[in-house]
Amino acid sequence: GELIEVAGSEAGKTIDQADPEVSDAVDFCHHYANASLQLTDEAYMAGARFVPVDVTVVASPWNFPVAIPVGGVAAALAAGSAVILKPAPPAKRCAAELVAAFHEAGVPRDLVVLAPLDDGDVSRYLVTHEGVDRVVLTGSYDTARLFRSWKPDMHLLGETSGKNAIIVT
């Protein structure tokens, strides 16, 4: 209920829009929790060696303020990474609720932290910091290019400017 209310007040979502987004977030948590078990399954890994990164920044959007950040945070945690959640400025309250929910679920406070920063120099410092191993961005193509211009060798996973185009022949 709280996440639905915050998604409504911050992102303008109706209950009909926010409720399935919260359900998607729960599904992401279940999916990545199960996926994490595969990383220790020798038969599944087939001789591959998994090496987690230390710190992942999840830069999430304003328009899906629950499901997308939860998916990024849960995936990074499942892969053994600490997470800094940097929400879009219009979605800071939603992000704070999400981080609190991860903590209530038992994730240690130092493994998921909130960086409710405005866009600009401080955000640049965060995503280019030498202690950050990976950035997960859901946002515009221009933002991805900006991040890459700040740090060309950045390990950037981006979902950018999608229009869900389909060609039917």
Predicted regions and their residues:
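N-terminal alpha-helical segment of soluble enzymes
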Residues: 1-15
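A generic alpha-helix surface/boundary motif
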Residues: 2-5, 23, 96
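Rossmann-like NAD(P) dinucleotide-binding subdomain of oxidoreductase/dehydrogenase enzymes
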Residues: 8, 12, 29, 34-169
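An alpha-helix initiation/capping motif
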Residues: 16-27, 120
